[in-house]
């Protein structure tokens, strides 16, 4: 059976990188994209100069300013970021049509059957990185492997502006040395659980008795054990029919209570509106949609039919309902709208 050739591309602090590209004076100072320190604004991203001070995405602007008083926070320009994303995807399509976007600045590419560079995934990744730097003016990191999990970990391995290639022969050795925090779904609380079991790297997880893992992680245990062995059969999925429009964020530190969850909701809703900007979705909006993933990996989703003008208050109410179902620390929040086919839903629902 032929090994797949998967590339994971991830731009380095994307929004901030675009701003630094357009204003080189920003390159050497700590800066971030977000709202003002007054109120409940949070950051979308921060450059590496700011991250030295502990500034991170989804952090309240007021907290970031306390960590780094010299931090420059600018509002950002979603249209500019979307254009850069479109330029990146145009480059991707020169090498494959099998592209799975994860966000504006991140995507999986399946180049298994690409004829470019005699089918060399490494050469393709090198060329994509070079072209994006030349044509878009920003750096991206890339991981090349036989599956999505290892490719994504590899793209993080040498950030920023790095390329990590994991050949089939080196795959098990590579994944064995990967800290478990790199596994998707492993947050702070899960790391603490694993640490209590003596698990810090995937090699530790490989050696752990499956029944012990299952007792602590339930239905997640099989996926964790597979990833720890470097096994991931998920295909690169090309979405052909949009059934929803949404944004979500996985937090580097779990949100401990409802108040912290409500504090990050405004930036998610702002990003959602920006994603909808200039796109003719309003006549198709049928339901509000909110997702919460807790620190124990359990997930809850709430939907509510749209019966009047769109209101951010509905998302706040849905968040309260979702949080009340578990009342545990939260590692991910997603907000969005379900879409109906245009011919079935013709309401005009402007934002208020």
Swiss-Prot record:
Domain of life: Bacteria
Family membership noted in the UniProt record: Belongs to the DNA polymerase type-Y family.
Site (Substrate discrimination): 15
CDD domains associated with the record: PolY_Pol_IV_kappa (cd03586)
Any one GO CC term of the record: cytosol
Major location (coarse): cytoplasm
Subunit details: Monomer.
Keyword terms, alphabetized: Cytoplasm, DNA damage, DNA repair, DNA replication, DNA-binding, DNA-directed DNA polymerase, Magnesium, Metal-binding, Mutator protein, Nucleotidyltransferase, Transferase
Function: Poorly processive, error-prone DNA polymerase involved in untargeted mutagenesis. Copies undamaged DNA at stalled replication forks, which arise in vivo from mismatched or misaligned primer ends. These misaligned primers can be extended by PolIV. Exhibits no 3'-5' exonuclease (proofreading) activity. May be involved in translesional synthesis, in conjunction with the beta clamp from PolIII.
One Pfam family, short name: IMS_HHH_1
Binding site for Mg(2+): 10, 105
Cofactor(s) named in the record: Mg(2+)
UniProt remark on cofactor binding: Binds 2 magnesium ions per subunit.
Reactions the enzyme catalyzes: DNA(n) + a 2'-deoxyribonucleoside 5'-triphosphate = DNA(n+1) + diphosphate
InterPro entries hit by this protein: DNA/RNA_pol_sf (IPR043502), DNA_pol_Y-fam_lit_finger_sf (IPR036775), DNA_pol_Y-fam_little_finger (IPR017961), DNA_polymerase-Y (IPR050116), DNApol_IV (IPR022880), IMS_HHH_1 (IPR053848), Rev_trsase/Diguanyl_cyclase (IPR043128), UmuC (IPR001126)
Catalytic center residues: 106
Organism: Marinomonas sp. (strain MWYL1)
EC annotation from Swiss-Prot or TrEMBL: 2.7.7.7
Location relative to the cell: Cytoplasm
UniProt-recorded name of the protein: DNA polymerase IV
Domain UmuC, first and last residues per copy: 6-187
UniProt-recorded Gene Ontology molecular function terms: damaged DNA binding; DNA-directed DNA polymerase activity; magnesium ion binding
Gene Ontology process terms (BP): DNA-templated DNA replication; error-prone translesion synthesis; SOS response
């Amino acid at each position: 059976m032929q090994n797949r050739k998967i590339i994971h591309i991830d731009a380095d602090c994307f929004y901030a990188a675009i701003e630094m590209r357009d204003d080189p004076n920003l390159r050497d100072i700590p800066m971030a994209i977000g709202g003002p320190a007054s109120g409940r604004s949070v950051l979308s991203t921060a450059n590496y100069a700011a991250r030295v001070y502990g500034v991170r995405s989804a952090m309240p602007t007021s907290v970031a300013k306390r960590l780094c008083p010299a931090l420059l926070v600018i509002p950002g320009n979603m249209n500019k970021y979307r254009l850069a994303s479109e330029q990146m995807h145009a480059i991707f399509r020169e090498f494959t049509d099998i592209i799975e976007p994860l966000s504006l600045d991140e995507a999986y590419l399946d180049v298994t059957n690409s004829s470019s560079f005699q089918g060399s995934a490494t050469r393709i990744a090198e060329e994509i990185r070079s072209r994006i730097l030349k044509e878009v003016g920003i750096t991206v990191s890339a991981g090349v492997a036989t599956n999505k999990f290892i490719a994504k970990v590899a793209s993080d391995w040498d950030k920023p502006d790095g390329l990590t290639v994991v050949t089939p022969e080196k795959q098990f050795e590579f994944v064995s040395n990967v800290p478990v925090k790199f596994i998707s779904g492993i947050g702070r609380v899960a790391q603490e659980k694993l640490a209590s079991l003596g698990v810090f790297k995937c090699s530790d997880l490989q050696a752990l008795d499956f029944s012990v893992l299952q007792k602590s992680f339930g239905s997640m245990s099989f996926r964790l054990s597979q990833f720890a062995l470097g096994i991931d059969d998920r295909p690169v999925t090309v979405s052909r029919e949009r059934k929803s429009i949404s944004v979500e964020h996985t937090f580097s530190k779990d949100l401990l209570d409802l108040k912290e969850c409500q504090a990050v909701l405004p930036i998610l809703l702002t990003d959602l509106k920006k994603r909808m900007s200039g796109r003719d979705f309003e006549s198709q909006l049928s339901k509000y949609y909110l997702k919460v993933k807790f620190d124990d990996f359990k997930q809850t989703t709430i939907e509510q039919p749209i019966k009047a003008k769109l209101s951010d208050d509905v998302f706040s109410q849905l968040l309260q309902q979702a949080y009340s179902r578990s009342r545990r620390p939260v590692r991910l929040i997603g907000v969005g709208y379900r879409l109906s086919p245009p011919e079935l839903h013709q309401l005009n629902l402007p934002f208020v």
